[in-house]
Amino acid sequence: MAKQYDMVECPFCDEVSKYEKLAKIGQGTFGEVFKAKHRQTGKKVALKKVLMENEKEGFPITALREIKILQLLKHENVVNLIEICRTKASPYNRCKGSIYLVFDFCEHDLAGLLSNTHVKFTLSEIKKVMQMLLNGLYYIHRNKILHRDMKAANVLITRDGVLKLADFGLARAFSLAKNSQPNRYTNRVVTLWYRPPELLLGERDYGPPIDLWGGGCIMAEMWTRSPIMQGNTEQHQLTLISQLCGSITPEVWPNVDKYELYQKLELPKGQKRKVKDRLKAYVKDPYALDLIDKLLVLDPAQRIDSDDALNHDFFWSDPMPSDLKNMLSTHNQSMFEYLAPPRRRGGHMPQQPANQGRNPAATNQTEFDRVF
């Protein structure tokens, strides 16, 4: 059971009634998110209701951790926490008030934008998206915070074209292992389709490379418009990773055989790395292909970090990164994954390019081949 902290009454918080809810824009295991406006100023905000699973036990430690992290992080490319609000305890809510986190409102999330076929990103605009995303990661990692849930739905974009990393509900502080004692963080983090191979193999002493893998998945998605590896289970996800990034072996990933799961699981053997080959039907820019390839490296120790990624030729070659504001100004409606038609399995799932010369039956990949 998660530790809890008895802070439900939150006596120093304003009442959430100062805001008027306008629309529900998100729903998940974390609770609900609403678009709202300040009744006096008209300022638009997002209200994230803290899910009180075990109300008797007080305020969830996971929410406290998120609040503490958001109060620490102040950066243009990280979502801004304005304040914490509450509802009054009353007989109508079993004498238990609710807690809301109040954020600056962002008009879109990246999953919602990618689900809309009318939204077209130019190469310059994709460069700007990735530059802002990597800037956000560089900042949080420099402040010793791991996001641990990188995915397109957690990347917000304002109407002015400013990207904000959001949903720090799974985030945590990290440190370098001390006195040869490895860290023992949970590996049950990161949405499956964006989860890196080290977590899938059970690693608990991990760091910033887990977020960079998610960044690579998101970067590829800017062209494919759907998550590039849609596994059903952890083993299935590792199979898809092996089919795209090559077989997981000690030759490409030293000491990978230390993982108990590596010994237990039957992972595809003899798979060649084909990140660039599989993506080149969608991604025409060679620098973009190279950066995606460097982000989707199996061995976390060899995966590119945010600093080196920001210095990659992709960002310093023509066309240069360009502002998103003009493109977004042609779209009046907010776009969020929650409000969009499914873009996942089936949806706009990109198909395997026809001229690959591959026989799925012969390679026994029919069941697993959900990459493209």
From Swiss-Prot:
Positions bound to ATP: I25, G26, Q27, G28, T29, F30, G31, E32, V33, K48
GO MF assignments: ATP binding; cyclin-dependent protein serine/threonine kinase activity; protein serine kinase activity; protein serine/threonine kinase activity; RNA polymerase II CTD heptapeptide repeat kinase activity
EC number of this enzyme: 2.7.11.22, 2.7.11.23
Active site location: D149
Subcellular localization(s) per the UniProt record: Nucleus
GO cellular component, one term: nucleus
Top-level lineage group: Eukaryota
CDD domains, A to Z: STKc_CDK9
Subunit structure as annotated in this protein's UniProt entry: Associates with cyclin-T to form P-TEFb. Also associates with cyclin-K.
Function text: Member of the cyclin-dependent kinase pair (CDK9/cyclin-T) complex, also called positive transcription elongation factor b (P-TEFb), which facilitates the transition from abortive to production elongation by phosphorylating the CTD (C-terminal domain) of the large subunit of RNA polymerase II (RNAP II), SUPT5H and RDBP. The CDK9/cyclin-K complex also has a kinase activity toward CTD of RNAP II and can substitute for P-TEFb in vitro.
Record-given protein name: Cyclin-dependent kinase 9
Gene source species: Gallus gallus
